[in-house]
């Protein structure tokens, strides 16, 4: 990110100030990566989010295996209205257990599973190799490691796309390898920041 400050302010360690702001590429229009992902599961909300889903598990689509591979757990970017609407809509598509088409680590077991029926546009700061997420699993060059999104944020529903038209695992892998941080040096391993 880029640090922006007022001209007359001085830096004070361990102190937050509205005079010093960090500007991240995913907050600027046209910068940052955007993904079209499928919500395949959810986690019950707590506190302010009681009665709706507080976070969702999203997946990319692998064309070779015809499976949905988890790439992020997301809980940010939603308005209160979004949370109500999405919970109500996805409740119509609940399934009893995780689909055999879903490649998800046991550590990400959801409270509720859904049929693959929607596509959401998601912005993310970066991608990293992950032992928890399964995006492009088997293609990363490391056994048991997939690709996960860092700091994912909900943007909107993509009504113009079917789930099998979501961002593919190959696209996720290409975006991962085209990051400046990966071209130069690796991001910290397992630095999945789900934003919740």
Q: What residue ranges belong to the model's regions?
A:
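Catalytic cores of nucleic-acid ligases and guanylyltransferases
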Residues: 1-196
């Amino acid at each position: 990110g880029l640090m922006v400050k007022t001209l007359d302010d001085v830096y004070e360690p361990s102190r937050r100030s509205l005079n010093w702001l960090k500007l991240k590429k995913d907050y600027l229009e046209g910068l940052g990566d955007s993904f079209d992902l499928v919500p395949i599961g959810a986690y019950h909300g707590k506190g302010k989010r009681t009665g709706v889903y507080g976070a969702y598990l999203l997946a990319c689509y692998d064309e070779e295996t015809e499976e949905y591979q988890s790439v992020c757990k997301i809980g940010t970017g939603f308005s209160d209205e979004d949370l109500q609407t999405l919970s109500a809509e996805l409740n119509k598509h609940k399934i009893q257990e995780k689909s055999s088409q879903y490649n998800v680590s046991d550590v990400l077991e959801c409270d509720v599973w859904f049929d693959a029926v929607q596509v959401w546009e998601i912005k993310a700061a970066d991608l990293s190799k992950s032992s928890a997420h399964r995006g492009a699993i088997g293609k990363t060059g490391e056994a048991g490691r997939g690709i996960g999104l860092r700091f994912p944020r909900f943007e909107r529903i993509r009504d113009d796309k079917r789930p099998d038209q979501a961002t593919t695992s190959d696209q996720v892998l290409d975006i991962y390898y085209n990051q400046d941080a990966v071209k130069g040096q690796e991001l910290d391993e397992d630095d999945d920041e789900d934003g919740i």
